[in-house]
């Protein structure tokens, strides 16, 4: 039997922070953490339980699915409760044995029985337990959730809770949305203790209904149109206007409608038209509209289909068109991008939600009364934490010249001349095309590049994407000898064809392209724009603008750096996988690949996709290094969180096999760019500011159980900076290699 690698994250190593040579400036920073104080003991009751048939300890997903299915029944008997090991914990005393049955649909329908014995003993959670007892974490999380749910001003959307009384609207000619300021909370186990992390999170909804969205499509009876609507809407989040609930769309049903779909209400079968009138006092205007399907399970685990009427549902999130509306995005930024001092103040307003005295009804307790009942107090943590600024290094351009980040021009390290290239432009943008070529030529001299005049391809005004693509195929189509290195598409008012052109370039025909908007040639600073275009094209042609002057300490390790990122493709229920690997010591030459994975066999395809890429990348490295393989591989894996580590089991085993068979050490690092932490510097006037790039947080607020660190990767001039989190997951690494990893991360972000 093949022994699989155990999925356990690396423990935090011992590091002498003061003696490292990769940072030189120690700072104290604020973190958005809150302190929890218990004014009295919390009593928990322990209940042993067993599940039949037995679920193995390794079957975490089955165990989680079982508890999720049975949770409603457990709450009816035990109130707020949680599972830890083979014990159920509750703040409610139950003195009899209880059995809970449910069905799970795994490989067939399986009935499970959870038998919970009467309470075995009591456990007290005290103030000193908060920072050391894992049970205290789950207990406090339940209490905070209970306190927040007592506030009638709050509406809950998965992990986000928003204040419905602070609803705001933004409307432009193209976009109309409502959004609610809100928060996310999570319990953090840090080096200094356990604290509550609170971060601001806004929830955005389309102002129109899903009915409006569906009816913007023509010919709803067409199978092709229905397929497009399903691809656009499935897996999207939505809320109903008549309740504080949100759901995920599983399907759009075009073969049923509110008039034909029935529901059992008080033992009487009625259609949805009558149900909405009786249950919610809502009159359905269009009785023949399609229905939204949400798949759930009942208390026994049996499939339960919920049907919703699009007239009463609103989509959450922004549509793609919204991000193209400059005025809208500016207005949204004004309301949501808070500079550090304002953000700290807004974060601390979380306390007012816990201490709110408004009640749901006369018989219920307010959030403030619940706080008093539990004897809990939550307040902003005033302590500042240690952080370090990493030493800067030189950037080297052509002629071994030092390049400063602020330099607008410099000699390029590895040049790719613009000699054989095409320029597509629309007839009405002729003057812009000429201006583009002249400014590219002018800008090229400062970089030491050569730019010759392109072959011009003039397209008719308002030509379709298909017209542009068919013309491009004359030069880059299958079986045609390629005489041109790349193409620039200059787009005017028809810039909506951008996605089709990039798809044709990258996925269909495989040629290098650069899309330029004609209006960028009509503004001030055209020369600066063309300088940036030149650098982008040079990079796409495998040129190198400059390199980091790494010390021998780094380059002699002969690392290969690999990045893997997954991203869901809304249309077609697919996931895109992008992979890139460095294949030289200076980390300036690359090998890349991509994959498209279907949802139905996502896990199997993904592990093959990643492992296959690593095998190819190692061979490419050997080609560039006289047959020598890399001594170590650092893999940065984005798209999977620490909490989803079991999902990585098969992927890790594949990578482990590939690397061990080739005697290559590897370091597998999870990357999370959407962290809930905010780190700010604080001055003597109690004003907060964003940190500069290169800030490293490697202790203090990091998880005490795992090896993780945070880096502020870029300069932020608007709003608040968000750090990137790195979990060094696998293999064993020495402290020396730890510093090399941190160093390489920062210099390659």
Which sequence ranges carry the predicted segments?
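Long, contiguous domain-sized segments
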Residues: 2-27, 40-41, 48-52, 58, ...
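Alpha-helix boundary/N-cap detector
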Residues: 61, 65, 135, 224, ...
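N-terminal leader/early-domain signal
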Residues: 1, 252-258, 269, 274-280, ...
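Domain-scale, conserved, charged regions that form catalytic cores
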Residues: 405-446, 567
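Flexible inter-domain linker/hinge segments
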Residues: 305-415, 524-557
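A residue-level signal for conserved active-site and pocket-lining positions in enzyme catalytic cores
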Residues: 276, 423, 635
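Noncatalytic nucleic-acid binding interfaces
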Residues: 1-357, 361-362
């Amino acid at each position: 039997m093949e022994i699989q690698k155990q999925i356990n994250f690396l423990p935090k190593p011992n590091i002498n922070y003061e003696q490292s040579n990769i940072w030189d400036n120690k700072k104290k920073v604020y973190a958005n953490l809150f302190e929890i104080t218990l004014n009295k003991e919390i009593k928990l009751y322990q209940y042993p339980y067993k599940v039949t048939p037995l679920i193995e300890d390794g079957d975490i997903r089955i165990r989680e699915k079982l508890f999720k299915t049975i949770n409603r029944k457990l709450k009816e008997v035990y109130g707020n409760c949680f599972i830890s090991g083979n014990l159920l914990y509750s703040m409610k005393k139950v003195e009899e044995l209880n059995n809970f049955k449910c069905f799970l649909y795994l490989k067939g329908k399986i009935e499970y029985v959870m038998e919970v014995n009467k309470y075995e003993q009591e456990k007290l959670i005290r103030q000193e337990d908060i920072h050391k007892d894992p049970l205290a974490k789950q207990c406090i999380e339940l209490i905070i959730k209970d306190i927040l749910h007592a506030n009638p001003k709050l509406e809950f959307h998965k992990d986000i809770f928003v204040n419905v009384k602070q609803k705001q609207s933004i409307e432009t000619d193209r976009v109309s949305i409502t959004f609610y300021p809100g928060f996310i909370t999570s319990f953090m186990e840090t080096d200094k203790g356990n604290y509550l992390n609170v971060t601001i999170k806004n929830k955005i909804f389309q102002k129109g209904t899903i009915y409006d969205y569906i009816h913007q499509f023509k010919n709803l009876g067409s199978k092709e149109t229905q397929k497009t609507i399903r691809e656009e809407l499935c897996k999207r989040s939505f809320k109903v206007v008549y309740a504080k609930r949100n759901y995920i769309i599983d399907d759009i049903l075009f073969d049923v409608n509110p008039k034909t779909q029935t529901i059992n209400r008080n033992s009487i079968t009625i259609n949805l038209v009558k149900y909405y009138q009786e249950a919610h006092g809502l009159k359905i205007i269009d009785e023949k509209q399609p229905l939204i399907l949400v798949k759930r399970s009942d208390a026994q685990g049996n499939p339960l289909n919920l049907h919703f009427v699009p007239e009463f549902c609103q989509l959450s999130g922004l549509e793609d068109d919204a991000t193209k509306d400059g005025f809208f995005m500016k207005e949204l930024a004004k309301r949501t991008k808070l500079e550090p001092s304002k953000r700290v103040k807004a974060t601390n307003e979380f306390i007012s939600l816990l201490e709110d005295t408004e009640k749901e009804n006369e018989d219920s307790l307010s959030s403030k009364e619940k706080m008093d009942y539990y004897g809990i107090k939550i307040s902003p943590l005033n302590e500042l934490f240690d952080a370090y600024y990493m030493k800067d290094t030189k950037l080297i351009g052509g002629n071994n010249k030092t390049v400063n980040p602020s330099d607008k021009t410099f000699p390029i390290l590895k040049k790719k001349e613009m000699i054989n290239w095409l320029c597509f432009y629309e007839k009405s943008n002729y003057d812009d095309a000429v201006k583009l070529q002249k400014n590219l030529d002018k800008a090229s001299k400062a970089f030491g590049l050569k730019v010759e005049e392109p072959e011009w391809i003039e397209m008719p005004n308002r030509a379709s994407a298909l017209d542009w693509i068919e013309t491009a195929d004359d030069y880059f189509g299958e079986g045609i000898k390629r005489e041109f290195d790349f193409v620039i598409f200059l787009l005017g008012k028809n810039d909506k064809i951008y996605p089709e052109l990039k798809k044709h370039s990258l996925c269909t025909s495989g040629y290098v392209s650069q899309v330029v908007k004609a209006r960028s040639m009509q503004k001030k600073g055209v020369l600066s724009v063309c300088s940036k275009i030149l650098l982008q094209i040079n990079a796409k042609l495998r040129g190198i603008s400059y390199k980091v002057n790494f010390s021998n300490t780094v380059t002699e390790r002969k690392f290969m750096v690999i990045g893997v990122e997954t991203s869901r493709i809304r249309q077609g229920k697919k996931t895109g996988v992008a992979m890139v690997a460095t294949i030289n010591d200076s980390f300036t030459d690359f090998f890349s690949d991509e994959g498209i994975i279907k949802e139905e066999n996502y896990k199997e395809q993904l592990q093959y996709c990643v492992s296959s890429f690593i095998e190819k990348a190692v061979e490419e490295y050997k080609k560039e290094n006289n047959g020598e393989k890399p001594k170590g591989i650092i893999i940065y894996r984005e798209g999977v969180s620490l909490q989803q580590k079991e999902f990585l089991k098969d992927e890790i085993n594949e990578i482990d096999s590939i690397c061990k068979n080739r005697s290559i050490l590897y370091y597998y690092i999870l990357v999370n760019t959407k962290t809930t932490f905010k780190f700010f510097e604080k001055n003597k006037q109690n004003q907060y500011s964003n940190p500069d790039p290169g800030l490293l947080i490697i202790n203090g607020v990091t998880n005490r159980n795992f090896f993780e660190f945070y880096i502020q990767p870029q300069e932020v001039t608007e709003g608040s900076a968000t750090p990137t989190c790195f979990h060094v997951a696998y293999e064993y690494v020495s402290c020396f290699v730890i510093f090399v990893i941190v160093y390489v991360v920062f210099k390659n972000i």
